[in-house]
Regions:
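Acidic, surface-exposed loops and disordered segments
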Residues: 1-240
């Protein structure tokens, strides 16, 4: 009898082969080695192939009900980046020299309402559910948001969306580390001022999206502090 726990999946339509490409020790070592870069070497660039893999890691990330409420904006325009800097205290010394700068956006409340054009598109065009199943699917969405998670205000619902965006961010950070590329997630910015600048510059439509977080990718040009984390005993509780 096979000891491969994923063998039973290989013949199921639509289910990928889950053969591991890294062992547990390799993955743990990767996570131990990953760190947030504080300064970048402006002469070293991430290849387009590697950047595409990072974006693919974000695209393939899980999301609640499979709604994928994110959008990624790659900002190449250096003039715009310079305009952004006064509003991004957490990006000083990073944004200027990083190879790639990405804004991660979340979809606004109206986009995430049952029967919105976006959720209908996800249901029918992306997830390939039949149109007849739309009512049941949207009804489940209402129950999930309003009752199961008791999300009543627009702010609460936007925060729920942002949680999904952070799942994509986490996968992008791990993918970049797996390829030896440094990264910096950035929350240190003046949200309202930066949203005003980006929407005025036509970076995104504020009726559709809101700004969630930034991330930079490149190659570090500085030493970094030793990584510190709490021990497992402080972060894990086991209930038998």
């Amino acid at each position: 009898m096979s000891t491969d726990p994923t063998q039973h999946l290989s013949n199921q339509p639509g289910v990928p082969n889950l053969t591991p490409c890294m062992n547990a020790e390799q993955v743990v070592q990767l996570l131990h080695n990953r760190y947030t870069a504080k300064k970048y070497n402006p002469t070293m660039r991430v290849s387009e192939e590697d950047f595409a893999a990072i974006i693919e890691a974000g695209r393939m990330s899980p999301s609640s009900m499979g709604f994928e409420p994110w959008h990624f904006v790659r900002i190449n325009n250096r003039d715009l980046i310079n305009e952004m800097l006064p509003y991004m205290w957490g990006a000083a010394g990073k944004l200027e020299d990083a190879s790639h700068v990405v804004a991660l956006l979340g979809r606004n409340v109206d986009q995430m309402k049952p029967y919105s054009s976006y959720l209908t598109h996800i249901h029918e065009d992306i997830q390939k559910y039949p149109h007849e199943a739309l009512d049941a699917r949207m009804g489940r969405c209402v129950t999930f948001i309003n009752e199961d998670h008791n999300l009543q205000t627009d702010s609460e619902k936007n925060l729920w969306v942002d949680k999904q965006v952070y799942l994509a961010l986490g996968n992008m950070l791990t993918m970049s580390a797996a390829m030896g590329i440094d990264s910096t997630p950035i929350e240190g910015f003046q949200k309202r001022s930066l949203e005003k600048l980006l929407t005025e510059r036509g970076v995104y439509d504020p009726e559709e999206f809101h700004l969630t977080v930034f991330v930079c990718f490149g190659y570090s040009d500085a030493e970094h502090r030793m990584k510190t984390r709490r021990p497992t005993s402080e972060v894990l509780t086991v209930i038998d």
